[in-house]
């Protein structure tokens, strides 16, 4: 129904990843499932009124994170995050902070080399492409000092690096799968079997996920409408301003 356009968005409820594997689901989470079904390279982003945190890597063991990182991947994630902020959240010139992988963001290569070898070059390349990217920053001081409030989004290198401060600082949040042709959101919590049937569950995040999906769909449609037929930039070709002719009505065109 989603692919056929019969519904506009999808909001998924929490799943138990162990149980769905036993049922033959075949994916580590909803994010990977939707990427497989609809194509594209998904970007997992946690969203709240206080912050937006994107992840370079998602559901992978921590021991594998460093080996998966590369300058090219980080640049792609920055491009995805910027595109999402512009099209889905109407941020005209988003500022994006990049977190380092190692303690103290590597201390100039003393505590790991990923920052110097991959992250700084990635930030520099992103800036060259017109993205307002900054960093890499040491994650602990970045959040403890409140520096995250100066940016429209934060790019974390791995799952817990982004989600621990997000859940600690945001009372409620939404998981948004960006960079897909469809809009998919979910609450920012798990199945919570420990409180099942006790009448104490908080519906806030699920409600926020529904509202966020609606808002993102409307923003994406709005952006598509305003950018569908842009006027050509003024250019000079052989001394003639070709855009002047382009902007005339058909009956006004010179032969």
Located regions from the model:
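Anion-binding alpha/beta catalytic cores of soluble intermediary-metabolism enzymes, centered on
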Residues: 1-114, 120-255
């Amino acid at each position: 129904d989603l692919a056929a356009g019969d519904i506009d968005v999808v909001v998924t409820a929490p799943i138990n990843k162990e149980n769905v594997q036993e049922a033959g689901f075949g994916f580590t989470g909803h994010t990977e499932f939707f990427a497989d079904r609809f194509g594209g390279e998904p970007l997992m982003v946690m969203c709240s009124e206080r912050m937006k945190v994107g992840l370079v890597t998602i559901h992978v063991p921590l021991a594998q994170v460093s080996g998966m990182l590369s300058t090219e991947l980080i640049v792609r994630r920055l491009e995805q995050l910027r595109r999402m902020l512009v099209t889905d959240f109407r941020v005209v010139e988003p500022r994006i902070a990049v977190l380092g992988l190692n303690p103290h963001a590597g201390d100039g290569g003393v505590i790991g080399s990923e920052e110097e070898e991959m992250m700084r070059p990635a930030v520099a390349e992103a800036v060259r492409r017109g993205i307002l990217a900054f960093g890499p920053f040491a994650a602990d001081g970045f959040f403890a000092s409140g520096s995250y409030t100066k940016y429209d989004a934060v790019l974390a290198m791995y799952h817990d690096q982004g989600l621990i401060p997000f859940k600690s600082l945001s009372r409620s949040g939404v998981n948004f799968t960006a960079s897909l042709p469809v809009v998919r959101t979910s609450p920012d919590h798990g199945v919570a079997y420990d409180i099942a049937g006790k009448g104490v569950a908080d519906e806030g995040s699920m409600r926020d996920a529904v509202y966020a999906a609606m808002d993102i769909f409307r923003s994406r449609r709005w952006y598509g409408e305003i950018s569908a037929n842009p006027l050509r930039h003024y250019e000079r070709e052989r001394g003639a301003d070709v855009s002047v002719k382009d902007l005339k009505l058909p009956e006004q065109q010179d032969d």
